Amino acid sequence: MTGKKRSASSSRWLQEHFSDKYVQQAQKKGLRSRAWFKLDEIQQSDKLFKPGMTVVDLGAAPGGWSQYVVTQIGGRGRIIACDLLPMDPIVGVDFLQGDFRDELVMKALLERVGDSKVQVVMSDMAPNMSGTPAVDIPRAMYLVELALEMCRDVLAPGGSFVVKVFQGEGFDEYLREIRSLFTKVKVRKPDSSRARSREVYIVATGRK
C-alpha cells in the first residue's frame, strides 16, 4: 500500500516536473536547472550582482545559480561555490565539494575566500526532504543559520545575502535575525518558484 502511494506520488512529481514551463525553458537554453530563473527574477527586482564582484554560492549543484551569476559579474568577478554533490566545472567558478555542515569543509571554504571582499553570499541549500515538516523544517533552518554565519564571517559592509528558506517554525525569528544585520530585507516568492512549495527567498542588502 505504502509503495503504491509512493509510486503514484513520484509519477505525479515527474509529470509536473517535465510539464513545468521553466524546466522546458531551461532545457531549451542549455541551463543547468530551473533555479536560474528564480535568481534572474530576484536580480531584476533587487540588482544584487555587478561586474567584478566576489560571490559565495552555497548549495551550488548542479550550478544554476553560479551559471547565472557568471553572466552578471563578468571575467573579473569570482564565484566560490560549495555543495555536498558534485558539480561539472563552470569557467569563473571555484568549486569545493563537501558537506557545508562539516567544520573542516567550512574552514576550507573560508581559506578559498581568503582576503577577498565578498559582496554577495547566496544560499539555495535544502536538506533531503522526508515529507514530515517536524523533521524537515529544523534541518532546513540549521542550514540557513549556517549560511548566515558565513555572512558574518566573510560579507563586506554593504554586501547582500539571498537565501532560500522554508516557511514554518523558526522562520519569523530567522527573519528578525537577518533584519538586525542588514539595512533592507525583502521576502520574495519568484514566479518560477512552484506555488505549492513552502520556499521563499529572503533578500537582504546593506550589511551593517
From Swiss-Prot:
Looking up Gene3D superfamilies in the UniProt record yields: Vaccinia Virus protein VP39
Q: Where does it live in the cell?
A: Cytoplasm
Q: What residues sit in the active site? A: 164
Per the annotation, which location comes first and is thus the protein's main one? cytoplasm
Indicate what this protein is called per its UniProt record.
Ribosomal RNA large subunit methyltransferase E
Question: Which HAMAP family did the record assign?
Answer: RNA_methyltr_E
What is the organism lineage in this UniProt record?
Bacteria, Pseudomonadati, Pseudomonadota, Gammaproteobacteria, Enterobacterales
What domain of life does the native source organism fall in? Answer: Bacteria
Gene name, Swiss-Prot/TrEMBL: rlmE
- Enzyme class, top EC level, equals transferase
EC id: 2.1.1.166
